[in-house]
Amino acid sequence: MIGVPVTAGPEEPGRRPGDASLTMRLVSEAADLAPARQFVRATLGGWGLADQAADFELAVSELVTNALSHGEGEIDVTVGLHGDSVRLAVGDEGFGPDPIQFREPTTTGGGGWGLRLVDGLSDSWGAHREPGRTLVWMERRLQV
């Protein structure tokens, strides 16, 4: 997978001064999660939040794995700082199930745990589809 920095994320309703959002586009060439994890770690570290990066690295691994397994095309990873919360979003060009639901986890195939982990790591999470695009996000308040 090759990671290409995009830029600051699109303007979002309710965005306040001091909020920040960065996006990286991943071009799928292999199932290598390292660029996504490094992007999350570097972004949060740049905002002085390196001590909180581990959980977001785990979450981005799960969300990108889902995008590789169930989506298509390029994958965008966005990390946003909004007030006292960090938001992580992963979008792909596929058509995920609507609504996205938990799958029964398996002990043999290793599948079905990703969204459960994201649920446990976040204060809130969700997913939505747009024409030709699926976006899954999680949000968590900063730990003080």
Regions found by a protein language model. Name each.
Residues 34-61, 107-109:
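Conserved short strand/loop->alpha-helix "switch" segment adjacent to the catalytic nucleotide/phosphoryl-transfer site
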Residues 22-38:
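STAS-typified acidic loop motif
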Residues 24-26, 48-50, 100:
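A short, structure-level motif marking secondary-structure boundaries and short turns
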Residues 1-23, 68-144:
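Conserved beta-strand-loop-beta-strand hairpin that lines the nucleotide-binding pocket
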